[in-house]
Amino acid sequence: YYFEKEPLGNAGALFKLKDKLTEDFLLLNADAIFDIDFNRFIKYHKEKGGLVTLFTHPNSHPYDSGLIFADTNNTVLRWSAKEDERPAYYRNRVNAGLHVISPNILETEITTAKVDLDRQLLKPLAGSGKMFCYDSPEYVKDMGTPDRYVAVCRDYREGKVSGKNLKNKQKAIFLDRDGTLNK
């Protein structure tokens, strides 16, 4: 653990722990509830070999979330923060706040003690070929507002949180080209 005497932002403490972080690590936002297959997420990160892998998915509030634009290989090309100008039409793919990060990212030149993870470390990696997105239907929800917290509590009680974990069998319907249901 690292105890901050002064607030260091959501990534400043990482630089204080730089010598202790010797292998890829998970960085998880504290205002999210999730139930995901971490082994699958980490395996994907290792296969891609980037500095960072973002857990991405569509959400109910892309207007106040970081939009992620990627190529067909899921290499992140552009990161549009909520305050950035956005195109009129975009894919609802957002950073869910779960990350697998290589300690090599801490070689980034940072001149301030207070560090913003998204703006100072992640967003500048977009387009470098070193950051990938992991698209998943698993349950990850930001519960940082009262309405979102109420929705997450309801989803938890109804079993939606654990039910979407990819370790569990998922229901699916397959249609052939003429729209016929197949068993």
Predicted regions and their residues:
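Active-site neighborhood of HAD-like aspartate-dependent phosphohydrolases
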Residues: 171-172, 177-183
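Short, basic/glycine-rich phosphate-binding loops at helix/coil junctions
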Residues: 21, 100-102, 181-182
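Conserved beta-loop-beta/alpha segment of the NTase-like Rossmann-fold superfamily
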Residues: 1-72
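Residue-level recognition of short loop/turn positions
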Residues: 72-73, 178
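Long, charged amphipathic helices and adjacent flexible linkers at domain junctions
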Residues: 162-174
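Catalytic-core segments of class I nucleotidyltransferases/pyrophosphorylases
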Residues: 25-26, 33, 39-46, 59-62, ...
